[in-house]
Amino acid sequence: MAAMAPALTDAAAEAHHIRFKLAPPSSTLSPGSAENNGNANILISANGTKRKAIAAEDPSLDFRNNPTKEDLGKLQPLVASYLCSDVTSVPAKESLKLQGVFSKQTVLKSHPLLSQSYELRAELLGRQPVLEFSLENLRTMNTSGQTALPQAPVNGLAKKLTKSSTHSDHDNSSSLNGGKRSLTSSSLQGGEVGGPDSGNLKGGMTNCTLPHRSLDIQHTTLYSNNSTANKSSVNSMDQPALQGSSRLSPSTDSSSNLTNVKLEVKKSPLSSILFSALDSDTRITALLRRQADIEIRARRLQKRLQVVQAKQVERHLQHQLGGFLETTLSKLPNLESLRSRSQLMLTRKAEAALRKAASESATSEGLSNFLKSDSISEELERFTASGIANLRCSEQAFDSDVTDSSSGGESDIEEEELTRADPEQCHVPLKRRSEWRWAADRAAIVSRWNWLQAHVSDLEYRIRQQTDIYKQIRANKGLIVLGEAPFPDHTTDLLSLSSEVKTDHGRDKLIESVSQPSENHGILVSNITESLSTKSCGAPRPVNGVVNSLQPVLADQVPGDSSDAEEQLHKKQRLNLVSSSDGTCVAARTRPVLTCKKRRLVRPSSIVPLSKKVHRNVRSGCDVNPSCALCGSGSVNTMPPEIHYEAPLLERLSQLDSCVHPVLAFPDDVPTSLHFQSMLKSQWQNKPFDKIKPTKKFSLKHRATMPCSLSDPVRKDRHKLVNSFLTTAMLKHHTDMSSPSYLTATHHPPHSPLVRQLSTSSDTSTPTSSGSQVAASTSQPVRRRRGESSFDINNIVIPMSVAATTRVEKLQYKEILTPSWREVDVQSLKGSPDEENEEIEDLSDAAFAALHAKCEEMERARWLWTTSVPPQRRGSRSYRSSDGRTTPQLGSANPSTPQPASPDVSSSHSLSEFSHGQSPRSPISPELHSAPLTPVARDSLRHLASEDTRCSTPELGLDEQSVQPWERRTFPLAYSPQAECEEQLDAQDTAARCTRRTSGSKTGREAEVAPTSPPVVPLKSRHLAATVTAQRPAHR
């Protein structure tokens, strides 16, 4: 501002129009004019004349020497600042607003007059900054004895006082406080108010409103370069002239101006009417208006401050929460590289990363312990409290409806609740708070929405890809072009036959009958072609009699080289030829094929899936296209999918109920029946059932209850039978699951003859006699078959569909009366004292060993004899094999020769199963040949051999020797069976040699009668057979 002062004070002629912001109007104005225009504009021209822009004042209050009537003009708009223009005037609309606030203490301290007045000082400090001073104050200011000096700057600018060229009556003057009381500029030079028109000064209080501008700025730019010498002497007297608009005269006219001011003050004393001219109402109205403006501005600034504060709080909380989550979940991988891919891939990777991070012990334990713990660190508690306080403060600032208490609540009830509340409450974990549940629900909704959006976008991408593939396949298809059809042969034959007709009338009829079908066919084809061409897009051309609307589009899409271009040209020519259909147009199958491009056969089932992900089977039960390439399922799996127990709960529930989505379903969407079903199923499966086996007597009674239930009418029997079948089947299923007979029962036929009769009785109606015969014929095999297991109706399982659709009829057989329940005395069922003294069967192990000792001895003798037979040469003429047995032929010379009984074939099975060589025969030992056998003994031998197949060795008849029983053995055996067999073999070899010498002296026929010893089993096989025999149980 100081730099602009010399430019404004150089030439008086350059400043044509100067606009100043003036104080509110004084008491001389009417209230209406004050309300309409509180601030007036004074225009000061270069020639020193003054033009007022306000309404005319009362002439009685005009104290000027030569009052001139001025024209009334329109009220100028409110101007908040002044503008300096060099050539032209500046409009009031383009004026700049320059507002400031005076420091009241600075004003009071800088001016000696104002500092002495206590009332003015209190008024300035308590209300708007308005200065009021009387003429005595001005006279004191004028007679201070100070020299005339340049005036202090107005609104921060030092103005050079303009000099009048004519020194007329209308000398340089200015208006103070809106032109209501005028003070000459010359009087202001010496610190006085006056001038040539000093008589114009109005008596009364002068209203001077200080602008809202700091006085420090004005002190920095007090004077221009011409008045820097004496600025300290007039500082105290220049303040009243700061608010008014005045012209500053140069320092050369200061003495004359001071004289004029003194004369004017002496002529017109105004002390008598000091307080009479004040208009308090106007002043109060202006002050209230200004106060309202200040309040509006303060409210606007407060709103802006609240917005900035709320943003700062939000940024601070986001930063703190982000740092907390980043610290807690610091092990999550970086997903920035996946943002360029599809949203579905990003979502899946994020879910996998979250699951992996949650599965880790450190992260999961730290986060879960933090959320479930009853105590939180002080730092988090402090941050939570401060954040809540800041958020509540911001919310209350923005929302005026937020109050501390409810509007409808009563104060006494609230006080009771406050007194009843416990101030020392324990800390509530975060998971139990309502804010946590709300945040969890919101996060669940957001995650499901993001998942759905990702899948929808992925599905749209796949649909577009499938459409592009379909268009590409259609574009790559070649067109089959057919040649021109030859003239039909049957038409030629018919025409030749028509020429042989003698009469013209008959020839005409024949020609018409022959040519009419071909002409009609040609017309029909042409009509079809026209109709198809009008319906098709663009200008398609018929190919093979059918218009292909895709042909012009596909021709542009198929890229090709020069050969393809020539091929397209030939195709167009051929199509033009074909399009001209005439009466000879025939079916396409009779026309020759010119070109046929091999088309690729695309099977959707054999297409490789578009994505590399593993396709899962469709979980829902809706109909799905099995050959869809995008689904990736080659065939719809009709079998129920296997439940993966490691999968999440919703995914497992979705396999049980198609209404539950594995991802989008909420836990509340799962029906309660599924939870109850899992509970009931686990209870039925895991509960151990104590199976009580009924006795045979009760089972027979239970078996006879079915015919009794059929004695009622048909309608009642139907319901009873179906209900009994279902209930008994369910109970039997649960009770027999763990029984061993359950496995054996599955191998029996599913339907018994009785059930077949029930199922077929509704289809065929048989007479009474035939029904009774069928019942009798079916009951007999049942009685025969059920030797051990009696027939039980609980074993019958009838499906629900069969039971619901089958019409149950009464069976045609004799009803068996069964007794009803009766009371039985328990004491009578107990046995008599005589029965208690009866001998009880001994079932101990010692008793069983004693009973089976005889069989064990026979078994031991058989095996020892078998291993002691000496080896014989096979192929001897004295032995021959017939029927698988080694039987010696009977000799006629010696009919009493003993005939040893050959062992049964079945008796050698046990030995052949464990021996590696050929199964040995078991004839009687040679030392027993001489013992004669009577027919009775022979019969007894055969009877014993056939009765017990395990022991094929016959008893020794009358010469039987008593054998001591074996002593009790402990396995493994202490002795070696191989050594014992070798010792017995040496003894048997000696006896065998003696037998051969005796038999060698006999005739050839007698020699043939002699039995042949079987080949000796190797020692290894003997040892194995003996070991196996020893390990077999002693009793059957």
From Swiss-Prot:
Pfam family, one: PEHE
Sequence segments annotated as region (Required for activation of KAT8 histone acetyltransferase activity): 781-813
Sequence segments annotated as region (Disordered): 145-211, 226-257, 399-423, 739-787, 869-931, 989-1020
Highest taxon in the source lineage: Eukaryota
Chain intervals with Polar residues compositional bias: 226-244, 886-896
GO biological process: chromatin organization; positive regulation of DNA-templated transcription; regulation of mitochondrial transcription
Gene3D superfamilies given in the database record: 6.10.250.3170
Cross-link annotation Glycyl lysine isopeptide (Lys-Gly) (interchain with G-Cter in SUMO2), location: K262, K331
InterPro entries: NSL1, PEHE_dom
Coiled-coil ranges (or none): 285-312
Residues where Phosphoserine is found: S249, S268, S922, S925, S976
Location within or outside the cell: Nucleus; Chromosome, Centromere, Kinetochore; Mitochondrion; Cytoplasm, Cytoskeleton, Spindle pole
Modification N6-acetyllysine, positions: K104
Residue spans of biased composition, Low complexity class: 245-256, 759-772, 906-919
Mitochondrion among keywords: yes
Keyword set, alphabetical order: Acetylation, Centromere, Chromatin regulator, Chromosome, Coiled coil, Cytoplasm, Cytoskeleton, Isopeptide bond, Kinetochore, Microtubule, Mitochondrion, Nucleus, Phosphoprotein, Ubl conjugation
Record function comment: Non-catalytic component of the NSL histone acetyltransferase complex, a multiprotein complex that mediates histone H4 acetylation at 'Lys-5'- and 'Lys-8' (H4K5ac and H4K8ac) at transcription start sites and promotes transcription initiation. The NSL complex also acts as a regulator of gene expression in mitochondria. In addition to its role in transcription, KANSL1 also plays an essential role in spindle assembly during mitosis. Associates with microtubule ends and contributes to microtubule stability.
Description of how the protein assembles with itself and partners: Component of the NSL complex at least composed of MOF/KAT8, KANSL1, KANSL2, KANSL3, MCRS1, PHF20, OGT1/OGT, WDR5 and HCFC1. Interacts (via PEHE domain) with KAT8 (via HAT domain); the interaction is direct. Component of some MLL1/MLL complex, at least composed of the core components KMT2A/MLL1, ASH2L, HCFC1, WDR5 and RBBP5, as well as the facultative components BACC1, CHD8, E2F6, HSP70, INO80C, KANSL1, LAS1L, MAX, MCRS1, MGA, KAT8/MOF, PELP1, PHF20, PRP31, RING2, RUVB1/TIP49A, RUVB2/TIP49B, SENP3, TAF1, TAF4, TAF6, TAF7, TAF9 and TEX10.
Protein name: KAT8 regulatory NSL complex subunit 1
